[in-house]
Amino acid sequence: MKRMLLTVLLVSLCAMGSTAAKKVYRRQIVKEFSVGARPELALSNCFGEIRIVEGADRKITVRVELRGEGKTEEEARRYAEAVNVDLSLSGNRVEGRTTFQKIICNNCGRAADFTVTVPRDVVLSLANQFGNIYINRATQPLTVTVKYGDLYLKEASTALVNVSFGKASIDRCAMLNLNSQYSGITLGTVGQLTGKTKFDGTYRIESVGRCTLTAGYTQIRIDRLSESCVVDKLRFSGLRIGEVARGFSEISVKASYSEVHLGLTPGHAFRADLSASYGQIHTGDLNIRAADTRSGRTNQLSGTAGASESPRARVSVTSSFGDIYLK
């Protein structure tokens, strides 16, 4: 036991010693570009963060902090200077790209952090690996690709987002196309959502108007649905919609090995077409005027719910190896 404690102590002291010996070297690059209306900014970065800040003039100002870490100051400087940043202006488009020269080092590191001040009407196209992206507001079409990093977006009008092995937190977006895998997704208010999700640990939407999704190995939770939700190929997953607006138009789900929970109440009026193979259909307090049939291992229910004899809204759920809950 004493020998084990001594070994652990020596390892800890070695780790502390190597950390204490690490030196940091920083250098900055600042470039300013004059642009016209609706300029474009395209950035491709890795091993660092991208921050977009809204400015008040017709300029795009790019500030890049390059950081090197090494056992000596000379090593740290050499690692920082082994990062190249190419910034250019072509017409009304600013482009930036970082490249890292290949070097072999021990107990060292490099990073490139961007802070970019842009006009409000800028069109953004951002890509980052091994780092986060921060955007307060995007009034023009936005394209973001982030891998091994997180996206924090406050507000956007139209956005195309690809995220993998990270997280995406989007507070508000009118039209969002989101493709994600092995990530955590948190959405606030979205007008229209389309996309694919696979192996996402968290996928939560506070409020959505219309959504069209394909999902695999992901639990999707929608707190409130206003108009329509179409989920195709819900495989080894789950869908839970907490609250559905009375004036909704459509819910359509094709599921396998997944449970489907829809927050429908006796106050809703809709046409139901439900089929559960190797599963059950649970209607709760709903009064569905329906023909409830069973064929082999398949339960089927077709009919209408609510006061209207010919309701406009439609609920269609086809499931295999999973239950359907309308309550």
Labelled PLM ranges:
Residues M1-K327:
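Intrinsically disordered, low-complexity terminal regions
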